[in-house]
Amino acid sequence: MVKKLLYIICYIFFWADISLSLPLCTEVDVRKWTNCKGEVNTPDGTKFIGEWKEGNPNGHGNLTYPDGRKYVGEWKNGSHDGKGTFTYPDGAKYVGNWKDGKQNGEGVFSYPNGAKYIGKFKNSRQHGEGTYISKTGEKLIGLWTDDQLNGKGIFTSPNGEKYEGEFKNSRKHGKGIISYPDGKKYSGEWENGKIKSEL
């Protein structure tokens, strides 16, 4: 944890040093902006402030949309690429890795209602190992595909209830074992979140 924190601090100071050393973009033609810092405002109210290379946002920059959406982070060839934060008008937020303008790699997506997903993403979808935590503390842990938990996984509840088994579209589906706070266990088969039969 300490090493990770030190890395983040070093990264911030490193970027700040590089950013301060870049000159302001002075060319009238944006396509000629390279290795400089500049601001662009479009007629629809979109604004970008940051670093440029060969006419494209490249390095670190802030993009603000007229509807309130905002991206702050790294860019490559005009796309979100690297580490960045995207916030939405409704309060939702994604913090994590990007590739070619999409959420890819490790990240955290926070929902407006207080729920949260922590794990891997692919093409802006929850995809790979991850944990979903509801606003009331329930957890879904396992492998995700296209925003849904599929295959083997674990469900836990704040009251001590625990299910280990198969899921389909984030619902208990297939074989599984559920443990209750009083110590009782049930082994059986589920279908669309409901008990189908006892094993």
Regions found by a protein language model. Name each.
Residues 5, 15-199:
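Glycine/tyrosine- and acidic-biased, solvent-exposed loop/turn segments at the edges of beta-strands
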Residues 2-11:
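Sec-dependent signal peptide recognition
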